[in-house]
Protein backbone atom coordinates (compact mmCIF):
# COMPACT_ATOMS: atom_id res chain seq x y z
CA UNK A 1 0.00 0.00 0.00
CA UNK A 2 1.20 3.52 -0.75
CA UNK A 3 0.62 6.59 1.35
CA UNK A 4 -2.12 9.09 0.56
CA UNK A 5 -0.69 11.59 -1.92
CA UNK A 6 -1.57 14.93 -3.46
CA UNK A 7 -3.12 13.35 -6.56
CA UNK A 8 -5.64 11.37 -4.50
CA UNK A 9 -8.94 12.82 -3.39
CA UNK A 10 -11.38 11.32 -0.90
CA UNK A 11 -15.07 12.13 -0.75
CA UNK A 12 -17.83 10.67 1.47
CA UNK A 13 -21.06 9.27 0.04
CA UNK A 14 -24.34 7.86 1.32
CA UNK A 15 -26.79 5.32 -0.05
CA UNK A 16 -29.92 4.57 1.98
CA UNK A 17 -28.69 3.46 5.39
CA UNK A 18 -25.17 2.95 4.09
CA UNK A 19 -22.20 5.24 4.62
CA UNK A 20 -19.26 5.05 2.26
CA UNK A 21 -16.44 6.86 0.53
CA UNK A 22 -14.79 7.26 -2.86
CA UNK A 23 -11.03 7.48 -3.38
CA UNK A 24 -10.21 8.95 -6.78
CA UNK A 25 -7.50 10.32 -9.05
CA UNK A 26 -8.00 14.09 -9.05
CA UNK A 27 -5.95 14.45 -12.23
CA UNK A 28 -8.51 12.44 -14.21
CA UNK A 29 -11.78 13.08 -12.36
CA UNK A 30 -12.88 16.51 -11.22
CA UNK A 31 -15.36 14.95 -8.82
CA UNK A 32 -16.71 11.49 -8.00
CA UNK A 33 -20.17 10.24 -7.04
CA UNK A 34 -21.51 6.80 -6.20
CA UNK A 35 -23.41 6.67 -9.52
CA UNK A 36 -20.08 6.23 -11.33
CA UNK A 37 -19.99 2.67 -9.98
CA UNK A 38 -23.44 1.66 -11.23
CA UNK A 39 -23.65 0.14 -14.75
CA UNK A 40 -27.29 1.26 -14.84
CA UNK A 41 -26.13 4.87 -14.52
CA UNK A 42 -24.11 4.54 -17.74
CA UNK A 43 -26.92 2.90 -19.72
CA UNK A 44 -25.84 2.05 -23.27
CA UNK A 45 -22.34 3.32 -22.50
CA UNK A 46 -21.77 0.25 -20.30
CA UNK A 47 -21.05 -3.12 -21.94
CA UNK A 48 -20.41 -6.36 -20.03
CA UNK A 49 -16.87 -7.72 -20.20
CA UNK A 50 -17.23 -11.18 -21.68
CA UNK A 51 -13.93 -12.89 -20.77
CA UNK A 52 -13.00 -14.14 -17.32
CA UNK A 53 -14.45 -12.90 -14.05
CA UNK A 54 -17.95 -13.61 -12.66
CA UNK A 55 -20.05 -11.26 -14.79
CA UNK A 56 -19.06 -8.36 -12.55
CA UNK A 57 -17.19 -6.07 -14.97
CA UNK A 58 -18.22 -3.59 -17.65
CA UNK A 59 -16.51 -1.53 -20.33
CA UNK A 60 -17.54 2.10 -19.80
CA UNK A 61 -17.44 4.86 -22.43
CA UNK A 62 -17.00 7.70 -19.96
CA UNK A 63 -16.38 11.44 -20.53
CA UNK A 64 -12.99 10.98 -18.83
CA UNK A 65 -11.99 8.18 -21.20
CA UNK A 66 -12.51 4.49 -21.93
CA UNK A 67 -12.72 2.70 -18.59
CA UNK A 68 -13.46 -0.61 -16.90
CA UNK A 69 -15.85 -0.87 -13.94
CA UNK A 70 -15.54 -3.91 -11.71
CA UNK A 71 -17.69 -4.92 -8.75
CA UNK A 72 -16.13 -7.13 -6.08
CA UNK A 73 -18.00 -10.44 -5.84
CA UNK A 74 -17.25 -13.40 -3.65
CA UNK A 75 -16.39 -16.79 -5.12
CA UNK A 76 -16.46 -20.39 -3.97
CA UNK A 77 -18.28 -21.37 -0.78
CA UNK A 78 -18.24 -17.79 0.52
CA UNK A 79 -20.55 -16.75 -2.32
CA UNK A 80 -23.29 -18.99 -0.88
CA UNK A 81 -23.21 -16.94 2.31
CA UNK A 82 -22.89 -13.50 0.74
CA UNK A 83 -22.76 -12.53 -2.93
CA UNK A 84 -21.02 -9.17 -2.62
CA UNK A 85 -20.64 -8.38 1.10
CA UNK A 86 -17.30 -8.34 2.92
CA UNK A 87 -16.43 -8.01 6.59
CA UNK A 88 -15.65 -4.42 7.56
CA UNK A 89 -12.10 -3.97 8.89
CA UNK A 90 -11.55 -0.29 8.18
CA UNK A 91 -11.58 1.88 5.05
CA UNK A 92 -7.92 1.32 4.15
CA UNK A 93 -8.47 -2.45 4.23
CA UNK A 94 -11.43 -2.49 1.87
CA UNK A 95 -10.78 -4.50 -1.29
CA UNK A 96 -11.25 -1.46 -3.52
CA UNK A 97 -9.02 1.01 -1.66
CA UNK A 98 -6.27 -1.60 -1.26
CA UNK A 99 -6.29 -2.47 -4.97
CA UNK A 100 -6.41 1.20 -6.01
CA UNK A 101 -3.31 1.98 -3.97
CA UNK A 102 -1.49 -1.18 -5.02
CA UNK A 103 -2.01 -0.26 -8.67
CA UNK A 104 -0.68 3.23 -8.01
CA UNK A 105 2.39 1.74 -6.31
CA UNK A 106 3.04 -0.55 -9.28
CA UNK A 107 2.70 2.33 -11.73
CA UNK A 108 5.22 4.30 -9.68
CA UNK A 109 7.61 1.41 -10.30
CA UNK A 110 7.00 1.92 -14.07
CA UNK A 111 5.21 -1.42 -14.40
CA UNK A 112 2.58 -1.97 -17.14
CA UNK A 113 -0.62 -1.64 -15.13
CA UNK A 114 -3.89 0.16 -15.99
CA UNK A 115 -4.30 3.53 -14.32
CA UNK A 116 -6.75 3.31 -11.39
CA UNK A 117 -9.34 6.09 -11.55
CA UNK A 118 -11.62 5.64 -8.54
CA UNK A 119 -12.39 3.17 -5.75
CA UNK A 120 -15.67 2.93 -3.83
CA UNK A 121 -17.09 1.23 -0.77
CA UNK A 122 -20.49 1.35 0.90
CA UNK A 123 -20.75 0.14 4.48
CA UNK A 124 -23.79 -1.02 6.45
CA UNK A 125 -22.94 -2.18 9.96
CA UNK A 126 -20.18 -4.79 9.90
CA UNK A 127 -20.43 -5.42 6.15
CA UNK A 128 -19.50 -3.50 3.03
CA UNK A 129 -19.56 -3.86 -0.74
CA UNK A 130 -17.07 -2.32 -3.13
CA UNK A 131 -16.20 -1.43 -6.72
CA UNK A 132 -13.28 0.01 -8.67
CA UNK A 133 -13.02 2.04 -11.86
CA UNK A 134 -9.86 1.97 -13.95
CA UNK A 135 -8.51 3.05 -17.30
CA UNK A 136 -9.17 0.62 -20.15
CA UNK A 137 -6.21 -0.61 -22.21
CA UNK A 138 -7.38 -0.50 -25.82
CA UNK A 139 -6.72 -3.20 -28.41
CA UNK A 140 -5.57 -5.95 -26.06
CA UNK A 141 -6.07 -9.71 -26.10
CA UNK A 142 -5.56 -12.05 -23.18
CA UNK A 143 -2.96 -14.78 -23.05
CA UNK A 144 -5.89 -17.22 -22.81
CA UNK A 145 -7.21 -15.99 -26.16
CA UNK A 146 -3.78 -15.85 -27.78
CA UNK A 147 -3.01 -19.41 -26.67
CA UNK A 148 -6.28 -20.76 -28.10
CA UNK A 149 -5.78 -19.05 -31.46
CA UNK A 150 -2.01 -19.17 -31.93
CA UNK A 151 -0.97 -22.13 -29.79
CA UNK A 152 2.81 -22.33 -29.93
CA UNK A 153 2.84 -18.95 -31.66
CA UNK A 154 1.45 -17.21 -28.56
CA UNK A 155 3.83 -14.89 -26.66
CA UNK A 156 5.15 -17.47 -24.21
CA UNK A 157 8.64 -16.01 -23.74
CA UNK A 158 7.24 -12.48 -23.47
CA UNK A 159 4.86 -13.70 -20.76
CA UNK A 160 7.69 -15.25 -18.78
CA UNK A 161 9.73 -12.06 -18.90
CA UNK A 162 6.68 -9.97 -17.96
CA UNK A 163 5.94 -12.03 -14.86
CA UNK A 164 9.60 -11.97 -13.80
CA UNK A 165 9.54 -8.18 -14.01
CA UNK A 166 6.56 -7.96 -11.64
CA UNK A 167 8.03 -10.55 -9.29
CA UNK A 168 11.29 -8.62 -9.19
CA UNK A 169 9.26 -5.62 -7.96
CA UNK A 170 7.75 -7.85 -5.23
CA UNK A 171 4.22 -8.32 -6.59
CA UNK A 172 2.50 -11.43 -5.25
CA UNK A 173 -0.51 -11.63 -7.61
CA UNK A 174 -3.38 -13.44 -5.89
CA UNK A 175 -4.95 -14.69 -9.13
CA UNK A 176 -2.31 -14.99 -11.84
CA UNK A 177 -4.26 -16.69 -14.62
CA UNK A 178 -4.27 -16.52 -18.41
CA UNK A 179 -7.20 -14.05 -18.45
CA UNK A 180 -5.24 -11.52 -16.37
CA UNK A 181 -2.25 -11.32 -18.73
CA UNK A 182 -2.88 -9.05 -21.73
CA UNK A 183 -0.95 -8.11 -24.86
CA UNK A 184 -1.60 -5.01 -26.94
CA UNK A 185 -1.20 -4.51 -30.68
CA UNK A 186 2.46 -3.58 -30.24
CA UNK A 187 3.23 -6.81 -28.40
CA UNK A 188 3.56 -5.11 -25.01
CA UNK A 189 2.36 -7.15 -22.04
CA UNK A 190 0.14 -5.95 -19.18
CA UNK A 191 -1.14 -7.43 -15.93
CA UNK A 192 -4.61 -6.75 -14.54
CA UNK A 193 -6.80 -7.67 -11.54
CA UNK A 194 -4.77 -6.95 -8.42
CA UNK A 195 -7.48 -7.74 -5.89
CA UNK A 196 -5.82 -9.24 -2.76
CA UNK A 197 -2.39 -8.74 -4.31
CA UNK A 198 0.45 -7.53 -2.09
CA UNK A 199 4.01 -6.27 -2.35
CA UNK A 200 6.42 -8.68 -0.64
CA UNK A 201 10.13 -9.29 -0.38
CA UNK A 202 10.82 -11.55 -3.40
CA UNK A 203 10.88 -15.17 -2.24
CA UNK A 204 10.74 -18.54 -3.97
CA UNK A 205 7.59 -19.88 -2.27
CA UNK A 206 5.09 -17.26 -3.38
CA UNK A 207 6.67 -16.85 -6.83
CA UNK A 208 6.29 -20.59 -7.44
CA UNK A 209 2.72 -20.44 -6.18
CA UNK A 210 1.92 -17.72 -8.75
CA UNK A 211 3.48 -19.71 -11.59
CA UNK A 212 1.73 -22.96 -10.66
CA UNK A 213 -1.60 -21.14 -10.61
CA UNK A 214 -0.91 -19.81 -14.10
CA UNK A 215 -0.08 -23.30 -15.38
CA UNK A 216 -3.33 -24.68 -13.94
CA UNK A 217 -5.30 -21.96 -15.70
CA UNK A 218 -3.54 -22.62 -19.02
CA UNK A 219 -4.43 -26.30 -18.77
CA UNK A 220 -8.02 -25.49 -17.80
CA UNK A 221 -8.43 -23.04 -20.71
CA UNK A 222 -6.60 -25.12 -23.30
CA UNK A 223 -9.65 -25.82 -25.50
CA UNK A 224 -8.86 -28.62 -27.96
CA UNK A 225 -5.13 -28.53 -27.28
CA UNK A 226 -3.58 -31.41 -25.36
CA UNK A 227 -2.19 -31.04 -21.85
CA UNK A 228 1.16 -32.12 -23.27
CA UNK A 229 1.18 -29.23 -25.77
CA UNK A 230 0.32 -26.72 -23.04
CA UNK A 231 3.08 -28.06 -20.82
CA UNK A 232 5.60 -27.71 -23.66
CA UNK A 233 4.60 -24.07 -24.12
CA UNK A 234 4.82 -23.50 -20.38
CA UNK A 235 8.40 -24.81 -20.45
CA UNK A 236 9.22 -21.97 -22.88
CA UNK A 237 7.50 -19.46 -20.60
CA UNK A 238 9.32 -20.77 -17.55
CA UNK A 239 12.71 -20.79 -19.26
CA UNK A 240 12.28 -17.12 -20.24
CA UNK A 241 11.10 -16.32 -16.71
CA UNK A 242 14.14 -17.96 -15.12
CA UNK A 243 16.54 -16.21 -17.48
CA UNK A 244 14.97 -12.81 -16.79
CA UNK A 245 14.91 -13.45 -13.05
CA UNK A 246 18.55 -14.49 -12.96
CA UNK A 247 19.55 -11.41 -14.95
CA UNK A 248 17.62 -9.21 -12.56
CA UNK A 249 15.41 -7.78 -15.32
Curated annotation (Swiss-Prot):
Gene coding for it: kdkA
Its EC number(s): 2.7.1.166
Pathway of action: Bacterial outer membrane biogenesis; LPS core biosynthesis
Protein name in UniProt: 3-deoxy-D-manno-octulosonic acid kinase
InterPro entries linked: KDO_kinase, Kinase-like_dom_sf
Lineage: Bacteria, Pseudomonadati, Pseudomonadota, Gammaproteobacteria, Lysobacterales
Organism: Stenotrophomonas maltophilia (strain R551-3)
Topology of this chain in the membrane: Peripheral membrane protein
Entries under SUPFAM superfamilies matching the protein: Protein kinase-like (PK-like)
Keywords for the protein's UniProt record, in alphabetical order: ATP-binding, Cell inner membrane, Cell membrane, Kinase, Lipopolysaccharide biosynthesis, Membrane, Nucleotide-binding, Transferase
PANTHER family in alphabetical order: SER/THR-PROTEIN KINASE RIO2, SERINE_THREONINE-PROTEIN KINASE RIO2
GO MF entries: ATP binding; protein kinase activity
Amino acid sequence: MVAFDANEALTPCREGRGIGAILFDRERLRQAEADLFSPQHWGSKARPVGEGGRGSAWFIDAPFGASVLRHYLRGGLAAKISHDQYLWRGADRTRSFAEFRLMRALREKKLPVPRPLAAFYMREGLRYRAAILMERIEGVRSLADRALVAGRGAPWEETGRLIARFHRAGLDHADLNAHNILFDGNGHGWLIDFDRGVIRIPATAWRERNLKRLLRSLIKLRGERSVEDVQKDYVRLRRAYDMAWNRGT
